[in-house]
Amino acid sequence: MSQVDINHARALVYQLLSSLFAREVDEQRLKELTSEAAQQFWEQLSLEANFTQSVDKIRSTLNGIKDDEALLELAADYCGLFLVGTKHSASPYASLYLSGEDEPLLFGQQHQQMSEFLHQSKLQVQSHFPEPADHLAVMLAYMAHLCCHSEDSVQLSFLQTCIDSWLAKFINQLTQCDKNGFYSAVATLTLAWVKQDIAQLEPAEAVIS
């Protein structure tokens, strides 16, 4: 497997994780996530010990949706966790976890920084996704872009400073609010994937100097 193929595969994982945070799972998306190809993907991903528990929860939830009511319940989870903005939710914005302010504002420093990254790469948040640029879905989508268009050092820096720096705090908040556990599993898988990717991107220590 060439490095290009590896980077493409990494990008696909980031795109998948991004899509799960970007919007609720609708009927079409459910078909994609439970297709034969998707089942093979989940199976392969679950072989990694650090991913197994999260992947199993994601798969069991998706495969267990057999009617519109169950799909609507998952959509309600997404709305309640990410769209309402109350103490019983877990807003997926970096600024809420990285800012030193008691009441951090949206569209703050992290949003401005992320907007600049997008601008430098000639990218922008799509109009159908009216969210601040420091939304986790945007950051993961940008990381997917970096996988195929940037040096390892750039990817490593972005992961460490812009995603890994707050993801654990987000998960801590999310697990307190997520009664059904699907999105907690997605977030936990995201963190495990990010940690593994960081380890792979870090330069190997020299044996001699």
Swiss-Prot record:
It comes from the Bacteria. It is found in: Cytoplasm. GO terms for biological process: protein complex oligomerization; protein folding. Coiled coil: none annotated. One of its GO terms (cellular component) is cytoplasm. Pfam families: Nitrate_red_del. Keywords: Chaperone, Cytoplasm. Involved in the biogenesis of TorA. Acts on TorA before the insertion of the molybdenum cofactor and, as a result, probably favors a conformation of the apoenzyme that is competent for acquiring the cofactor. Belongs to the TorD/DmsD family. TorD subfamily. This is Chaperone protein TorD. It comes from Shewanella baltica (strain OS195).
